[in-house]
Amino acid sequence: MAAKRKTAAKRTVQKAAKKIADPSRWKFGITFPIVLILILFAAAFVYGGYLESGTEEDEPPQVVSNFIKKDADLAVHYIDVGQGDSSLIVYKDKSILIDAGERDSGSTVVEYLQSLGIEKLDYVIATHPHSDHIGGLPDVINSFEIGTVIAPRISDEMTPTTKTYERFLTALSGKGLRLTAANAGDTYSIADPDIESDNTEFEILAPVKNDYDDLNNWSVVLKLVHGGTSFIFTGDAEQSAENDILDSGADGSADVLKVGHHGSSTSTSKAFLKAVSPSIAVIQCGTDNSYGHPHAETIEKLDSSNVKIYRNDYDGTVIIYSDGKDIRAVTEKGDAKQNVDN
């Protein structure tokens, strides 16, 4: 009976997905504790220094709640949602959200975005259908104007039957949104059309294949480029998916690496880390989480490569700014032990 119920549930979800699909282009026909008082923000957040050749600014930047630069060129926010992932990219009038943590983190992400004055998300990227990545997305989808929603096109046999995934599909359907397949090699420009030299864009690096037997390896991996700086976001991609990226010939080098799978030893292989060659690594994990993330093996590999490590469990939310030449890090807990030179 249990097997029959599971099969029926899978058929229900698959039927719902196919019912809202555009088969020609694979688009589904559907359509932090950060919620702290501003005084706490002002007290808790401090600026890190420029990496490489950056210099101090002559005048203090315009800020929101005393730590978020309102007039920043490009900002990447690694939002503290506990044991989950949520990253926000803000560039001029464009905003991109990658995941939104567990279901109970949805309101956290919504209020964080609202504190920045965001009304529209030009892109929402659901890296893969695990609850600690897409659980909070329905709240986000229901709270903002949404442009393009990108997710992996998962095979029928791997289609999840969870309530979390059903809530995600329902939220999309309720807003009349369409889900666009993440295809390796696709690029999306967010450049300022008035600046001829602006190269700001993100490229989908993975999933490379369509036959993974672990949802983590279906994760959307993307590379964001702004001027001479770059960022990679890996979802929960594990070493199998990392190897496929390397074999694809894609340029995986980046200044900042969002470490895969919350710092699990199943991700961030030595070969992948060498190819990315980041100056900074950000690990999105919860305090004293039951998985033991990040694993010691991952930290050792990052340390031995002289990579500066930021962690949500130690540093709270991490924001990295780029002016196209240099990057600057801001953390919620500037006195955290992980905020010293590695």
Could you say what each language-model-derived stretch is?
Residues A2-N342:
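Non-globular, low-confidence helical/coil segments that flank catalytic cores
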